């Protein structure tokens, strides 16, 4: 288990392009939410699900649910809600549409957090991924609140406002399943591709 880290699954998206709640989609016999919760449970004993539409999620009874503080405020609102509900020093925040994340990925991110205020991976395409990242509750909660009150909706703005350790994909590429870590499942076509990969993972 990782010390001083609480895990959060963001399940509050509207899933308009998918047409159904992504956290309830099944892959390899488990919902996306169950898959992510299983990997998080290998590194932390405390897991919470953030979102306003979580009542029907099929997850272990020890997992708590917490609502958004700022309703309909997108991804930054979800990160803010996680930080608000976090009882540990760090929040490990994972979006529900990353079904191929692993506990080894989480351990790799956590291993470099010392002296930083956030840890965020860089995808293979060079784009930072704020929705599979570690946030130190102080100062990130305070800054997230300030950003939201200024009208900001993108969590990348939070990462750019604190001391962030950017983890290059080359630092993660040797981990098993690394090529799929950040496969974002947004559409039925994405889900079809993920289902094919799911039989391999």
Short names for language-model regions:
Residues 159, 187:
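A residue-level signal for conserved active-site and pocket-lining positions in enzyme catalytic cores
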Residues 2-152, 160-179, 192-199:
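Nucleotide and nucleotide-moiety/phosphate-recognizing core
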């Amino acid at each position: 288990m990782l010390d001083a880290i609480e895990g959060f699954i963001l399940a509050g998206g509207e899933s308009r392009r998918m047409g159904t709640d992504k956290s309830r989609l099944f892959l390899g016999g488990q919902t996306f939410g169950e898959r992510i919760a299983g990997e998080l449970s290998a590194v932390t004993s405390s897991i919470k699900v953030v979102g306003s539409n979580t009542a029907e999620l099929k997850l272990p009874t020890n997992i708590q649910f917490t609502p958004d503080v700022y309703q309909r405020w997108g991804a930054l609102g979800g990160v803010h809600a996680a930080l608000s509900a976090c009882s540990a020093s760090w929040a490990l925040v994972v979006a529900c549409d990353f079904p191929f994340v692993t506990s080894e990925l989480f351990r790799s991110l956590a291993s470099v957090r010392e002296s930083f205020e956030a840890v965020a991976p860089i995808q293979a395409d060079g784009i930072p991924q704020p929705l599979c990242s570690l946030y130190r509750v102080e100062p990130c909660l305070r800054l997230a609140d300030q950003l939201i009150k200024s009208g900001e909706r993108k969590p990348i703005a939070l990462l750019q406002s604190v001391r962030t350790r950017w983890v290059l994909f080359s630092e993660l590429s040797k981990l098993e399943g690394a090529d799929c870590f950040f496969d974002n499942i947004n559409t039925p076509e994405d889900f079809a591709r993920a289902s094919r990969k799911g039989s391999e993972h």
